[in-house]
């Protein structure tokens, strides 16, 4: 791991220039053209793949084909991550949108290669498949990947229909996702601050002020802004879900959860058990919300109260705000308390400018971690507004980055892991931060604040995410009968929130239009971007408890689990 110095400041802007040439330059255009030509050539080769069986030159031909697949997929990962980073940091930039669209237009070629690969693997007999895989070190090293792709073929339309669907998706389902990115990226929220009306990006809006009037002002200003694009977002949501349902119907899938579970390498029984246990036991969180309401002087909390600081949770004379430099340092220190390897990694990522955290207008909402396969690096995006919740977000995203770092020397095809296991690494990092802070806290004010944040996280993963799941599930059920207007979508959201939160919030304190503001519903390539968070949270909580019993050997065992996420199904991996 590259050395870093203790005196290096943690800058708030990431370094993208060392990864690829700027998208506006000729060098980037040359790389993009080379990628396009490479895909075209590989797509043609994929039409003539030999049988996946021993004998003749089949093994040599397959290794050569898969190595070229590997090279181009690594480049695809880099290009997509690179332009995604630029677009997130400068949401209004039309050039970045054009490059995103250009990359999306190449997806049918990737899909053609993938389809031909999976059909060839599917057509191989079990004995031939095993014999050829075992005969070559490269194939044997990627046996899990090949088996997964073989399994994927069962969820494919006939070849011609599959390729047509991929072509149509560029200006169909994925275009609706890009439309949402543009609408939300252009959105500005007008709020009153110190007697002046100022415009902010959604990611700059905070609900953690100790003054309820400020939280209300921010909430209603945000609600008004999001409502202005609700009808367009309803169109996007309807067509994203409608496209999926059409595909599922053509595939003969009776349950719209089959595909999300397949993508997470997870059994339906695991999902059902998880929600069943949570539903039975989250009454304790209802008690927490009621206690917090009493401490805030409210009969029940409103949506905008859930992140409010508790009275007395701030030590007299101290500010509840935490500057980025201090927050980043806190993450490094707490990570180091778990393992030197994790701490050194976080320090390296921060000092080498892997993180974009500046609080400024013009950025997209949300936070993410994305990887650059050829560079063996990651980049983290967020907007740091000087809150302890932001520190948790930073830890969360660096947990993702550490996961990729641990896998960086594995075969590229075994560096891909499902979202539920991805969220295990990120939420484990949050747990390390929170538990270490709690252990080190000295005053009752500090302990109270940390416990409040930990319980608020539990509400987020076990109630808020549950509401998203219930909403998306019922939305898909109703969407099967036709499109839903924005008003009906909001009704579904309200019902899901009340059920998931056990009606713990005030009657006028819900957020029916939450579906408009939540990016996760509009990610066209990942349906049900919700339950994996809860799975990861529960698993990471259990892992942290085990770490307290296992002693000094646990960090290495944890690394072993992260490696297993790229080459195993979910249940066996854990």
What are these regions (language model features)?
Residues 317-322, 355-377:
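Catalytic zinc-binding patch centered on the HExxH motif and its immediate surroundings
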